[in-house]
Amino acid sequence: MSEQTGLALPQTMDRSCWVCFATDEDDRTAEWVRPCRCRGSTKWVHQTCLQRWVDEKQRGNSTARVACPQCNAEYLIVFPKLGPVVYVLDLADRLISKACPFAAAGIMVGSIYWTAVTYGAVTVMQVVGHKEGLDVMERADPLFLLIGLPTIPVMLILGKMIRWEDYVLRLWRKYSNKLQILNSIFPGIGCPVPRIPAEANPLADHVSATRILCGALVFPTIATIVGKLMFSSVNSNLQRTILGGIAFVAIKGAFKVYFKQQQYLRQAHRKILNYPEQEGA
């Protein structure tokens, strides 16, 4: 019996906390715990030191699981039993925490949907006319309005994403040397280029995405203004807006095609100069 006590005493006195590296001699009143499968010097740890270490790992989430950094054994963490009132409150708090992300997503989707509905209604009144637009929406089926109005901004954005100017540019570069009309209007357009420049993806830049969004949403307003300026003799608001939109798209597209072609030629004729030698070198 005395030999077993003599063997156990050195083992107890050799305990060392792997967090603060203190031993039994440093603090004889400290509470020790062996929370994992580790052996040797990392087997023991102070209860208070391990509590602080677990708090750092959980970062305020008391339900998060924490494991030993050496053997990866999960710590067995127990809490005192809760009373019925505290248990119900804790359950409600966890349910609310889990439901909040879904509720936030639903609110976001609902906000976007009703914003699209409002934009669609304003667009109808702007294109058709204020009084005529209200009459059309009052006579329409409510279900049709709830489905049709939010599709207006979606269709505008999808239509804006169609880059028809690029197809025109390809045809321009392919057949410009065969069309004498283009050569007479734009001298030198059919001349061969020394190299083919690399073209960037227009949708790769987030700025291009914002330009597509803003351009699509402001298009009905621009079409209405252009229609009033260029086709004031047309009595129908809808026809005037459609003509204004077509004219705006055609004029803007023509300038954009010409601008891109000039940039293409400028990049094709780019040269890299020799490095200037310093005098006396």
Swiss-Prot record:
A zinc finger (RING-CH-type) spans 9-78. It is a multi-pass membrane protein. Its main location: mitochondrion. Keywords: Endoplasmic reticulum, Membrane, Metal-binding, Mitochondrion, Mitochondrion outer membrane, Transferase, Transmembrane, Transmembrane helix, Ubl conjugation pathway, Zinc, Zinc-finger. SMART domains: RINGv (SM00744). Zn(2+) 1 binds at C17, C20, H46, C49. The chain crosses the membrane at residues 102-122, 142-162, 212-232, 241-261. Pathway: Protein modification; protein ubiquitination. It is found in: Mitochondrion outer membrane; Endoplasmic reticulum membrane. GO terms for molecular function: ubiquitin protein ligase activity; zinc ion binding. Mitochondrial E3 ubiquitin-protein ligase that plays a crucial role in the control of mitochondrial morphology by acting as a positive regulator of mitochondrial fission. May play a role in the prevention of cell senescence acting as a regulator of mitochondrial quality control. This is E3 ubiquitin-protein ligase MARCHF5. It comes from Gallus gallus.
